[in-house]
A protein has these predicted regions:
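Short beta->alpha linker loops
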Residues: 3-7, 28, 87, 107-110, ...
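Acidic, Mg2+-coordinating phosphoryl-transfer loop and its flanking beta/alpha structural elements
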Residues: 84-124
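Surface-exposed amphipathic alpha-helices with a cationic face
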Residues: 9-16, 69, 92-96
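Conserved H-loop
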Residues: 43-47, 75, 121-124
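A short, structured active-site edge motif that brings together acidic residues
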Residues: 43-58
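Conserved Lys-Pro-Asp/Glu-containing loop-to-beta segment of HAD-superfamily phosphomonoesterases
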Residues: 61-94
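Short, acidic loop-to-helix structural element flanking the phosphoryl-transfer center
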Residues: 1-24, 30, 34
Length: 139
């Protein structure tokens, strides 16, 4: 059962208005991820939606993140910067495997301490902190 946490649309809108490129990287299969995002109108709030493959070539979070990077032309050597935002250990581990920091969302599905144990650089407890924490990260 999928839902959107209260305040997420407003936080995403603020980040988009401030010029951030936003992408969803999910381990849900792409063919499921896109319709779910469309149902909640997330497709209008982000720049891209990337999910796992049907042929099992892209299952793990780091594989999905790398696939998203390839599609958007992310180039760290050219100065591009990214931050993973997630609510499970798979997000933190996937970020680490791609050389990224992970901002943990304490309101999600993680067990207490899970995000910190897996290397999230910070865990926030309220949706209302999201945009400002991301903006602070990139200053």
């Amino acid at each position: 059962n999928n839902t959107i946490y209260d305040g997420i649309p407003e936080q995403l809108s603020k980040l988009r208005a401030d010029g951030y490129y936003l992408a969803i990287a999910s381990c849900k299969p792409q063919y499921q991820c896109i319709p779910i995002c469309e149902h909640f109108h997330l497709d209008t709030m982000v720049n891209g939606i990337y999910g796992a493959s049907e042929d099992n070539s892209r299952l793990d979070k780091d594989q999905v993140i790398q696939w998203a990077f390839d599609h958007i032309g992310f180039d760290e050597a050219a100065g591009d910067k990214a931050l993973m935002v997630g609510d499970r250990w798979t997000d933190a581990d996937g970020a680490k495997a791609c050389g990224l920091d992970c901002l943990g969302c304490g309101w999600g599905y993680a067990e207490p301490g899970e995000l910190k144990e897996h290397g999230a650089y910070k865990v926030i407890d309220s949706v209302s902190e999201l945009a400002q924490t991301i903006e602070d990260y990139f200053v």
